[in-house]
Design a protein with these regions (language model features):
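ATP-dependent kinase catalytic cores of phosphoinositide-metabolizing enzymes
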Residues: 2-133
Length: 133
């Protein structure tokens, strides 16, 4: 989706709650989140060696993750309240547990950030699969 300001945004509760698409029993989405080389091309302003811009983007992602994590209990409570709302992506406590695991609420901030960085690297490394999807 595109705002009037030109900013892109997309809300997909399915992804943040661990509901990934499959077809004929094959998991179509195999990365923690979508981070294509096309996105990276735009972030780097079309320059292949512009690691400064990409570094800034990555730092913003890490900062945003930690902010979300700090408010994790609020998110868990709000999603728990929505269990009966009829959202197809939010039907069981298992969906909420996926969110807890993603935010690494049982871990220290350092461990949680390490987990996020690993997921970020995996999304980047396996981004070719999103083109196949």
């Amino acid at each position: 989706m595109v705002k009037k300001t030109g900013q892109l945004f997309h809300i997909d509760f399915g992804h943040i709650l661990g509901n990934f698409k499959s077809k004929f029993g094959i998991k179509r989405e195999r990365v923690p989140f979508i981070l294509t080389y096309d996105f990276i091309h735009v972030i780097q302003q079309g320059k292949t060696g512009n690691t400064e811009k990409f570094g800034q983007f990555r730092q913003c992602c890490e900062d945003a993750y930690l902010i979300l994590r700090r408010h994790g209990n609020l998110f868990i409570t709000l999603f728990a309240l929505m269990l009966t709302a009829g959202l197809p992506e939010l039907t069981s406590v298992k969906d909420i547990q996926y969110l807890k695991d993603s935010l690494a609420l049982g871990k220290s901030e350092e461990e949680a950030l390490k987990q996020f960085k690993q997921k970020f690297d995996e999304a980047l490394r396996e981004s070719w699969t999103t083109k196949v999807n």
